[in-house]
């Protein structure tokens, strides 16, 4: 018994030395786990001799001694093989080589530099879970150790095992566990990955001409006369009178005078839209002088639809939001228009609502 006490004292003294050393060399971590194996063997031998205490320490049960010894042996052998690979010269701390991290998903792999991945289930900010994506993953093959990067997509968190994706977190299973399993959003490194199961259409879908923006539902149809931009003073011709009477209504007096038509153009500078809110043209009598502040969101159609759905949680921060639309050109990008009562409300919206980096926002002013 005295011999076992002396051996245990010497072993634990060296273990404490490695704790204080806080080395980042793999060789030191291998020596540390060799001492842990030795400590487990001493405790197992003491239990076989029916010893309940040794050096004022309670001797674990035989089952516990075996389990800890197997863990130490497994990790010690894995570190020795890693030492013989090209990654043996990298920095390895005691935290990087602990057994708890070794058996954390992905299991039986060494991992470094974890980043947090937050998943929001069912668009409920109160129903979130955090997961770890490892920047570096070291896994063992028949040819030796390999190093790869951890990745994340809408399905889960994975690493590339050869040419195959090895998922170690399945967001679908997590969504069934913590929510309805129908929808979830992945937030990682300032980006948002939307669940494609919620977005039914694809980016190639054609937008129907019947899909019009809510804020523009009451606007009158523009004629070619209102879209042209003459730059000179001209005499209003007689045929123009009947056309203007139809636009202005039967009771509106008609005058044939020399008028200067203002330039009504939409200028785009530094992602800010400016337009003239007033007009002296009598032919535009049906246009309202109401001016609203707007934000155009431009990007992938599916992302815009999912983003627009999340706007329901922030109804007090905007006035109206349009459906997804696009210009009549060969482009897959869609546009969503949001209107605001004031510039302050718009600023509050942009501060509160997270806009993904894949979506570009353009500020502007529009007359209704």
UniProtKB/Swiss-Prot annotation:
PTMs per UniProt: Phosphorylated. Sumoylation plays a regulatory role in E2 transcriptional activity.
Residue ranges of the region described as Transactivation domain: 1-200
Record keywords: Activator, DNA replication, DNA-binding, Early protein, Host nucleus, Isopeptide bond, Phosphoprotein, Repressor, Transcription, Transcription regulation, Ubl conjugation
Bias kind Low complexity: ranges: 252-263
GO terms of molecular function: DNA binding; DNA-binding transcription factor activity; nucleotide binding
Subcellular compartments: Host nucleus
Compositionally biased residues, Polar residues: 211-226, 272-283
GO process annotations (BP): DNA replication; DNA-templated transcription; regulation of DNA replication; viral DNA genome replication
Region of interest: Disordered: 211-283
SUPFAM superfamilies assigned to the protein according to its UniProt record, in alphabetical order: E2 regulatory, transactivation domain, Viral DNA-binding domain
Alphabetized InterPro entries for the sequence: E2/EBNA1_C_sf (IPR035975), Nucleotide-bd_a/b_plait_sf (IPR012677), Papillomavirus_E2_C (IPR000427), PPV_E2_N (IPR001866), Reg_prot_E2 (IPR033668), Regulatory_protein_E2_N (IPR036050), Regulatory_protein_E2_N_1 (IPR042503), Regulatory_protein_E2_N_2 (IPR042504)
Region: DNA-binding domain, residue numbers: 291-368
Site of covalent link Glycyl lysine isopeptide (Lys-Gly) (interchain with G-Cter in SUMO): 298
Domain of life: Viruses
Primary localization: host cell
Gene3D superfamilies on file: 3.30.70.330, E2 (early) protein, N terminal domain, subdomain 1, Papillomavirus E2 early protein domain
GO CC, any one term: host cell nucleus
Role, per record: Plays a role in the initiation of viral DNA replication. A dimer of E2 interacts with a dimer of E1 in order to improve specificity of E1 DNA binding activity. Once the complex recognizes and binds DNA at specific sites, the E2 dimer is removed from DNA. E2 also regulates viral transcription through binding to the E2RE response element (5'-ACCNNNNNNGGT-3') present in multiple copies in the regulatory regions of the viral genome. Activates or represses transcription depending on E2RE's position with regards to proximal promoter elements including the TATA-box.
Homology family: Belongs to the papillomaviridae E2 protein family.
Subunit description: Binds DNA as homodimer. Interacts with protein E1; this interaction greatly increases E1 DNA-binding activity. Interacts with protein L1; this interaction enhances E2-dependent replication and transcription activation. Interacts with protein L2; this interaction inhibits E2 transcriptional activity but not DNA replication function E2. Interacts with protein E7; this interaction inhibits E7 oncogenic activity. Interacts with host TAF1; this interaction modulates E2-dependent transcriptional regulation. Interacts with host BRD4; this interaction mediates E2 transcriptional activation function.
Descriptive protein name: Regulatory protein E2
Lineage, top ranks: Viruses, Monodnaviria, Shotokuvirae, Cossaviricota, Papovaviricetes
């Amino acid at each position: 018994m005295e011999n076992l006490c002396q051996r245990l004292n010497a072993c634990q003294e060296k273990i404490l030395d490695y704790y204080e050393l806080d080395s980042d060399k793999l060789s030191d971590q291998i020596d540390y786990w060799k001492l842990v194996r030795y400590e487990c063997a001493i405790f197992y031998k003491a239990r076989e001799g029916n010893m309940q205490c040794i050096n004022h320490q309670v001797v674990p049960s035989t089952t516990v001694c075996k389990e800890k010894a197997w863990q130490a042996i497994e990790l010690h052998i894995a570190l020795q093989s890693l030492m013989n690979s090209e990654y043996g010269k990298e920095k390895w701390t005691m935290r990087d080589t602990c057994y708890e991290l070794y058996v954390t998903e992905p299991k039986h792999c060494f991992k470094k530099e974890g980043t947090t991945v937050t998943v929001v289930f069912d668009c409920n900010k109160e129903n979130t879970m955090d997961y770890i994506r490892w920047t570096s993953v070291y896994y063992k093959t028949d040819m030796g150790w390999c190093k790869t990067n951890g990745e994340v997509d809408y399905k889960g968190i994975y690493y590339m095992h050869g040419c195959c994706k090895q998922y170690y977190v399945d967001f679908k299973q997590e969504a069934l566990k913590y929510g309805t399993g129908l929808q979830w959003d992945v937030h990682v490194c300032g980006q948002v990955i939307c669940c494609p199961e919620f977005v039914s259409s694809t980016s190639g879908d054609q937008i129907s001409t019947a899909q019009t923006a809510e804020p523009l539902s009451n606007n009158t149809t523009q004629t070619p006369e209102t879209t042209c931009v003459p730059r000179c003073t001209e005499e209003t011709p007689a045929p123009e009178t009947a056309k203007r009477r139809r636009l202005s209504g039967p009771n509106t007096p008609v005058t044939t005078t020399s008028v200067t038509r203002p330039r009504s153009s939409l200028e785009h500078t530094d992602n800010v839209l400016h337009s003239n809110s007033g007009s002296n043209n009598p032919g535009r009598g049906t246009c309202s002088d109401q001016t609203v502040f707007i934000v155009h969101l431009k990007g992938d159609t599916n992302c815009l639809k999912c983003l627009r759905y999340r706007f329901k949680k922030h109804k007090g921060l905007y006035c109206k939001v349009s459906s997804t639309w696009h210009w009549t050109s060969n482009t897959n990008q869609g546009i969503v228009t949001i209107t605001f009562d004031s510039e302050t409300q718009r600023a509050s919206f942009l501060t509160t609502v997270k806009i993904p980096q894949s979506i570009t926002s353009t500020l502007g002013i529009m007359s209704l």
